[in-house]
Amino acid sequence: MKVRVRLAPSPTGTLHIGTARTAVFNWLFARHQGGEFLVRIEDTDKERSKPEFTTNILEGLKWLGLNWDEQPIIQSQHVDDHRAAIQKLLDLDLAYRCYASETELEAMRETQKAQGQAPRYDNRHRNLNPEQEAAFQSEGRSAVVRFRIDDVAAISWKDLVRGPMHWRGSDLGGDMVISRRAPAKEIGDPLYNLVVVVDDAAMSISHVIRGEDHIANTAKQLLIYEALGLPIPQFAHTPLILNSEGRKLSKRDGVTSISDFQAMGYTAEAMANYMTLLGWSVPEGTDERFTLQQAATVFSFDRVNKAGAKFDWDKLNWLNSQVLHDLPKDQLLHELKPLWSEAGWALPEENWCLDLAELLGPSLTLLKDGVDQARPFFEEPTLQADGLEQLAMEGAKAGLSNLLDQLDSTSWDGFDVKQAQQLLTNAAQAANVKKGVIMKSLRAALLGRLQGPDLITTWGLLARIGQDLNRLRRCL
């Protein structure tokens, strides 16, 4: 059997990290098995589904490197198939029309609640005779379609993550609504549990991989598979992503959208790497830093955890920093250039920009850090408190003055590191201070602060665009 898996997001919002992690696990399993990864856009919620969310989801998957193998399926384009399946269930007497009004159903739930019972449909219209149906129709009542669920039904499957799973029909809340309310004798909009079964069968999906919050849906859907005589896929229910307090990660916890992570300066490689680790343990002796392609060679469900996976910002930041540190300077510049241009900076020649990217790379955690750290190379910096304090030290300005005098009288063809070090030594001796005082003071003059990348390389870059002398003079 060929492995075919699918991601089935609803375009009612941007690509959530939970959905993206599900996509990663689906993609890894498909690639490990030599199978196919498909995408189905579940847009049957007409009020909340928006084209811009579909675009965001697909672009997010592309950004993460999760390429799909067939054109994405749009669920709403197959509604006739869904209604045909409902009609088949009606014809087989495995489903029926329920005319109970919302007011009646709410009263039923309130009564159950008052009696200390869990709310569930009481199957009141399960066995209406033709005369009763005609009476409801003559009142102008609309109806939903419900799928019959026997309380004694035994539902079992072997979950690829959780092992044997066992449910009973009585656990599922009564007969299940499979289409929205519509005028009598019509079939309203088909609902999730029916639609998913029909679509997965039509797409020949072999494995359904999704979050553990779908376990109850799986129990319901297995009954529909059997009723329609459709082949049943294997199921894997992955752990939820949790916040620091152990609750399901939600929008209340802040950033959860992949596009937000992208805007914050996280790389696609680090995000995909981290999401793989959210609920999956690497084989012993395997580095926790890897590409998707590397992970696909060893991915298996026996290493997917049952317990929820806590989101760890420190781990994500570390992974992102490692990716940025190791990027070749041309690739790093490719990422940084748009950010520098967006900041309004006129960029010098390419080689200078490449050298700046190489200088900043080891100190970056996020791509956006490359804007803050590059700022003093494009704009004259404001002296910070630590810089002012350094320049006020005894001998600091005298040493910088001597350094400036040497530079004014020195002729060199390009910036020479050895000669620069000698100039600093000379300045320290002239001011009768340690060389470190002069180096810190020079950093304060060039960058406005004492923290920053390698001093000599920084000096060389600013010298190449004629800014070193200007900044020294400003501080004297």
UniProtKB/Swiss-Prot annotation:
Motif, 'KMSKS' region: chain positions: 248-252
Sequence motif 'HIGH' region, residues: 9-19
Any Pfam family hit: Anticodon_2
Entry keyword set: Aminoacyl-tRNA synthetase, ATP-binding, Cytoplasm, Ligase, Nucleotide-binding, Protein biosynthesis
Gene3D superfamilies documented for this protein: 1.10.10.350, Glutamate-tRNA synthetase, class I, anticodon-binding domain 1 (1.10.8.70), Glutamyl-trna Synthetase, Domain 2 (1.10.1160.10), Glutamyl-tRNA Synthetase, Domain 3 (3.90.800.10), HUPs (3.40.50.620)
Subcellular compartments: Cytoplasm
Gene Ontology biological-process entries: glutamyl-tRNA aminoacylation
Keyword Cytoplasm: yes
Binding site residues for ATP: 251
Enzyme Commission (EC) number: 6.1.1.17
GO CC term (a single one): cytosol
Subunit and partners: Monomer.
Protein task: Catalyzes the attachment of glutamate to tRNA(Glu) in a two-step reaction: glutamate is first activated by ATP to form Glu-AMP and then transferred to the acceptor end of tRNA(Glu).
Name this polypeptide is given: Glutamate--tRNA ligase
Species assigned in the record: Prochlorococcus marinus (strain MIT 9303)
Gene: gltX
